[in-house]
Amino acid sequence: RQRHPDCDKPPDTKRCTGHNPAFYYNPRRKNCERFSYGGCGGNGNHFKTKQLCHCHCHEND
C-alpha cells in the first residue's frame, strides 16, 4: 500500500468546532501520536484511530 501523501505534514491543531481526539503520523519518531484535531480544514495527517494512522502512514524499513 502506498503511503498517504500528507503523512509528513505537521498536525493541524487550530480550533474550529471543538476538541476531537485524533492521531497524526510523526515522521521523526516514525510513530502515530495523539493530538486534538480542531474539526475543520487542515491536512490529511489526522486519523480517528491509531490503527488507521499506522495503516496509512507507517514506513516499511
From Swiss-Prot:
Query: By its UniProt entry, which InterPro entries does this protein fall under?
Result: Kunitz_BPTI, Kunitz_BPTI_sf, Prtase_inh_Kunz-CS, TFPI/VKTCI-like
Query: Record's Gene3D superfamilies?
Result: Pancreatic trypsin inhibitor Kunitz domain
Q: Which GO terms describe its cellular component?
A: extracellular space
Which species expresses this protein natively? Bungarus multicinctus
| Oligomer status and interactors | Heterodimer; disulfide-linked. The A chains have phospholipase A2 activity and the B chains show homology with the basic protease inhibitors.
Top-rank taxon, per record: Eukaryota
Q: In which tissues is it expressed?
A: Expressed by the venom gland.
Put simply, this protein is called: Kunitz-type serine protease inhibitor homolog beta-bungarotoxin B5-B chain
Q: What is its main location?
A: secreted
Q: What does the function comment of this entry state?
A: Beta-bungarotoxins are presynaptic neurotoxins of the venom. The B chain is homologous to venom basic protease inhibitors but has no protease inhibitor activity and blocks voltage-gated potassium channels (Kv).
User: What Gene Ontology terms describe what this protein does at the molecular function level?
Assistant: potassium channel regulator activity; serine-type endopeptidase inhibitor activity; toxin activity
Q: Which cysteines are joined by disulfide bonds?
A: C7-C57, C16-C40, C32-C53
Q: Where does it live in the cell?
A: Secreted
Pfam families according to UniProt:
Kunitz_BPTI
> Any idea which UniProt keywords this protein has?
Disulfide bond, Ion channel impairing toxin, Neurotoxin, Potassium channel impairing toxin, Presynaptic neurotoxin, Secreted, Toxin, Voltage-gated potassium channel impairing toxin
The UniProt entry's sequence similarity note says: Belongs to the venom Kunitz-type family.
Boundaries of every BPTI/Kunitz inhibitor domain copy: 7-57
